[in-house]
UniProtKB/Swiss-Prot annotation:
Belongs to the Ni-containing carbon monoxide dehydrogenase family. The keyword Heme does not apply. Keywords: 4Fe-4S, Iron, Iron-sulfur, Metal-binding, Nickel, Oxidoreductase. [4Fe-4S] cluster 2 binds at residues 46, 49, 54, 65. Pfam families: Prismane. Cluster B is an all-cysteinyl-liganded 4Fe-4S cluster; cluster C is a mixed Ni-Fe-S cluster is to be the active site of CO oxidation. Cluster D is also an all-cysteinyl-liganded 4Fe-4S cluster that bridges the two subunits of the CODH dimer. One of its GO terms (molecular function) is peroxidase activity. Homodimer. It comes from the Archaea. Its EC number is 1.2.7.4. Its cofactor is [4Fe-4S] cluster; [Ni-4Fe-5S] cluster. [Ni-4Fe-5S] cluster binds at residues 256, 292, 336, 444, 475, 516. This is Carbon monoxide dehydrogenase.
Amino acid sequence: MKNCIAAIPEVKEMVEKAKLKGIETPHTRFPNQFPKCPYGLKGVYCILCANGPCRITEKTPYGVCGATADVIVARNLCRAVAAGTSCYVHCAENAARALLSAGKGEGSYEIRNEKKLKFLAKKLGFDANKDAKQLAVEVAEFILDDMYKPRWEKSELVPKLCPEKRLEVFEKLDILPGGAKGEIVDALTKTSTNLNSNPMDLLVHCLRLGLHAGFTGLLMTCWLNDILFGSPKITVVENGFSSVKPNNVNIMITGHQHALIQPLCEAAMEEDLIKMAKEAGADEIKIIGATCNGQDMETRIAHLPESFVGYIANNFTTEPLVATGLIDAVVSEFNCTFHGLKFVAEKTKTKLICIDDMAYVEGAEYIPWEPENAKEKAREIIKKAIEAFKERKGMQKDYYDEKVKSVVGVGEESLVEFLGGSVKPLIELIASGKIKGVVGVVGCSNLASGGHDNIIVTLTKELIKRDILVLAGGCVNSPLKHAGLFDPASAELAGENLKEVCKSLGIPPVLNFGACLSIARIEQVAVAIAEELGVDIPDLPVAASAPQWLEEQALADATYAVDMGFTVHVSPVPFVTGSELVTKVLTEAVEGLTGGKLIPEPNPYKAADLLEQTIMEKRKKLGI
């Protein structure tokens, strides 16, 4: 591999410099994994028992147990969606624990957004006029209790969060789930050896899991963090790789859980720790936002202390960034925390610290987070980072003088506030044709779809060129940010109509909604538009794209989106094509049930055609 295939030049240079230092990154490991297993790519492999591995071919259409391609593919998919759902539920669980501690007055967490607390309490059926702390305890306990219900007890949380028209669909299909953890455990049970061999039942279970991924996981994590730390506020920032300065104690965070990292940002501003850092030869202590947590925090950067520099790196940029020598410590609390960080850190003498054992990297020091001791643990971590800074003196540090202007902090509330209090102005722009429609470009990045971030940037530019407004959330935001697409000046790249809209409002044609958790916020915008028009989500000229999905959480995201009635473009093609049944259900038949479906398409230009076609068909049906 002569050159690193990456959309952002600085990342490409980081990888090349890492190679010269003898440091491997995902970009250099990826080519070594070819050729890929064709059975794995199609999903027709099974390793569930000692008779395996079994693979399905024309000559051997059954596994030893008799499992068909349909069964094996559906089973693998259900397991993946269950795992992805469990990840999001874990994040919501810890956020609820933080809120519970705030309500009980135990630890350092506070209720900073009583308005959002009362909004959520009312939605869940509580008397919103109660004392805020009492309300916080009741809301947190309700959410946690709902998570822990068995599958045979219906979730109360999901129906209370569902839009009315979607709830009718879910009731008709009988896919309203039981408790989140019960659904996840039973999905693992029924996909074990010689148990469920009904592919349709397994796919229906995916739909139930998707509702928990979206409502219990994504939406609850967003809203609980809003209560604890403030809702996203539209803000203009200027940051980039230049924010990672060689003379600072730089602590990079990886994960999804704002609740676990907020105390770190606050501790980095404490005078005694700043004094300690200066005595070690540093100028300041800075928290470097990476992966989804960095984005989630940047949406609230208006509420955060100056120690947080902003969102700098997505999943596949973390190892190259550590390889620059600029990072003194990495604090992991969830994915995307790449295992290769161990090997990079060994070369750069970077300190690895884990605060949630879900992201326990080999070689990391484990300092467990608990809501009650979060402040003390944060101080301990910063002291270790300062010590690492001292020990790393003389280490080569490759500084990048890159800075971009970005509009951040867009959310379902801040967008409506910007529009004057309702979504009507957006509806009018869509109805007039100034904006053809809206596409949520969301999710991960990968190396398999045209290289690191390439399809994300190409597809997004192609969509805005066609007067389609893009709402972005997830690791996609790193290349979109570094490519300048969150800068209002990028309106010049949009089609004439969208350009005019953006210039008149002073906004970019790509709106940064933050983390992959914010997929729920994008969905809430669609809900608001649908309710204003009195229609259901599948009727709207909106769609979604996961142009470089990577992991099981992305499959849970896609399932949630299909539940909600979105047409969802995905690349690469999921590992399901070995089953004609599963492929047909996901790309065709499910549309007749929920109104949503998947469109697999690896070519970004063809994907843009398909998404535009979807939007134009919806416009035609609405008569606009």
